[in-house]
């Protein structure tokens, strides 16, 4: 897509004060992690209570790892989510098409041998338009603080061109996000651990610094 100021998603929200602080810092979207294996897990009812108190125009994203499409549809309705982020390699085209209550963000965790044709095939078969690329680690589904190797990210994002909205995640912090944006030119950037005091507990100063760095890149 044509380069514009990148959209900013702050993920792993567990508290209302963090959600509001992220919003007022300038985040475009907030992520709520519904994976029971995550240190940033939030129960759907708690997420719904936070989302009800958000100001208008803030996008809300549910992160799903082990739920079925029917469970995702139900949680999305309970929480009034805008997007479902499918953060598990086991979610394929069939599962994406079965999520009918909201648009999907499909996550890929590329290793050095990653073939972008895998993404292009997914686009063609599912019509999903938004993809998030996170650092690969076989024992974890995101939130590790690890980065995608820069030349690998460049190769993927250049190859995708205008075919999708591509979001960069994985180890982004206030100190490195501007360089990553200038080099890779993603549609959006995503951070969780990079703006925290502890898993699920955000650092307001870091969130503000991250947003400022991303907007000024």
From Swiss-Prot:
Its EC number is 5.3.1.24. Belongs to the TrpF family. Pathway: Amino-acid biosynthesis; L-tryptophan biosynthesis; L-tryptophan from chorismate: step 3/5. Keywords: Amino-acid biosynthesis, Aromatic amino acid biosynthesis, Isomerase, Tryptophan biosynthesis. This is N-(5'-phosphoribosyl)anthranilate isomerase. PANTHER family: N-(5'-PHOSPHORIBOSYL)ANTHRANILATE ISOMERASE. The keyword Manganese does not apply. One of its GO terms (biological process) is L-tryptophan biosynthetic process. GO terms for molecular function: phosphoribosylanthranilate isomerase activity. It comes from Chlorobium chlorochromatii (strain CaD3). It catalyses: N-(5-phospho-beta-D-ribosyl)anthranilate = 1-(2-carboxyphenylamino)-1-deoxy-D-ribulose 5-phosphate.
